[in-house]
């Protein structure tokens, strides 16, 4: 079996277990795909059924799979994922991403993750580009710039990006992945806005 065939199988398996009632993907399951009580990836995470992080990390491989396998079912799943970000995960007022949700997409966290904001800004744009839907690209491009602009709230005078914020108090830790995603995210924002 080829690597591409394995990727296709994993895509079908993920899709088989998605939330058909409210859309999106649950955080975790037992080893036999049953509901699990503790869905957290770490002690720091909220024990909620859905997260931005899971959806972001499903969007990324779906985008890359779509590059080599332009399957209609995959295109529909990609479009649904982008729409979930636009309609549920993205805060319409602040342009930051919400982090945790119940199964009906009710917000369950007040933390702002600057690294995930800037990461999502470029991943959403890239996902729309690879999908090749001109209408979706027109919607996502300005939104991706707005998310990058919101992420600027985490930028410090030395050019680094802090980890996160809650109720206006910043966690001043510097994590490598946040700095790396900032390079890519701000590069895309510049390319798309020339600012």
Task: Name every feature range the model reports, one short phrase each.
Residues 1-195:
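Glycan-recognition and catalytic cores of secretory/periplasmic carbohydrate-active enzymes
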């Amino acid at each position: 079996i080829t690597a591409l065939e394995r990727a296709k199988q994993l895509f079908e398996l993920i899709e088989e277990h998605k939330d058909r009632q409210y859309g999106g993907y649950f955080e975790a399951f037992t080893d036999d795909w049953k509901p699990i009580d503790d869905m957290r990836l770490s002690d720091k995470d909220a024990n909620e059924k859905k997260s931005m992080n899971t959806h972001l990390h499903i969007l990324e491989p779906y985008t890359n799979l779509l590059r080599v396998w332009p399957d209609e079912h995959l295109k529909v799943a990609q479009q649904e994922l982008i729409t979930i970000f636009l309609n549920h995960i993205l805060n319409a007022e602040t342009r930051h991403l919400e982090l945790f949700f119940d199964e009906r997409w009710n917000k369950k966290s007040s933390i702002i993750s600057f690294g995930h904001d800037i990461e999502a800004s470029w991943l959403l744009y890239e996902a729309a580009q690879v999908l090749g839907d001109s209408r979706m690209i027109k919607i996502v491009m300005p939104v991706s710039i707005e998310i990058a602009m919101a992420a600027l709230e985490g930028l410090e005078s030395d050019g680094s990006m802090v980890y996160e914020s809650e109720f206006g108090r910043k966690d001043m830790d510097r994590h490598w992945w946040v700095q790396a995603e900032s390079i890519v995210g701000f590069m895309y924002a510049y390319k798309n806005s020339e600012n």
